[in-house]
């Protein structure tokens, strides 16, 4: 009887936890310009082009003035929108320091094949804005996503801006 009660309690708590995350409203300012059904199946590449690979920025953001904005964390501690117009004035002048003080939502410290499986990933790369241990700019991502998916694009932008 005790074993059944413990199992039922665990199942009920799991269901409550699942439903509380599913019932969160979308982050404010979230705009979707494509449908998830339009995203093709994984082809072996770490990224996919959306919207015909055409940017769609509001007219007021088409400026040479640098800026960066970060959403506040939601009630579950998740990052929201990070948005910047990167200029040389935002780029760091010092080396990146440790970001281990930030524990992004979903963080698990695990190794696979001698490498850490998960990385603290900057939404806007450190080399672009110099934001180091900003919890509003760090998410949990796989090493593959960070190194193969995000870093090549960060490097392209940094090379262009320099």
Predicted regions and their residues:
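Bacterial N-terminal signal peptides that target proteins for export
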Residues: 1-11
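C-terminal motif of bacterial Sec signal peptides marking the signal peptidase cleavage site
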Residues: 17-21
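Bacterial signal peptide processing site
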Residues: 23-26
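N-terminal module-boundary/linker segments of secreted carbohydrate-active enzymes
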Residues: 28-72
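Domain-level detector of nuclease and nuclease-like folds
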Residues: 55-162
């Amino acid at each position: 009887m005790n074993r059944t009660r413990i199992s039922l309690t665990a199942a009920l708590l799991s269901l409550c936890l699942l439903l509380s995350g599913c019932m969160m409203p979308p982050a404010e300012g979230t705009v979707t310009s494509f449908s998830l059904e339009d995203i093709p199946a994984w082809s072996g590449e770490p990224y996919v082009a959306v919207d015909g690979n055409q940017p769609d920025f509001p007219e007021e953001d088409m400026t040479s003035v640098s800026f960066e904005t970060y959403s506040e964390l939601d009630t579950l501690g998740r990052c929201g929108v990070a948005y910047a117009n990167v200029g040389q004035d935002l780029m760091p002048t010092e080396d990146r320091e440790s970001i281990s003080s930030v524990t992004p939502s979903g963080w698990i410290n695990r190794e696979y094949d001698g490498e850490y499986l998960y990385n603290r990933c900057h939404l806007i790369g450190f080399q672009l804005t110099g934001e180091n241990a900003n919890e509003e700019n760090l998410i949990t991502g796989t090493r593959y996503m960070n190194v193969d998916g995000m870093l090549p694009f960060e490097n392209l932008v940094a090379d262009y801006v320099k």
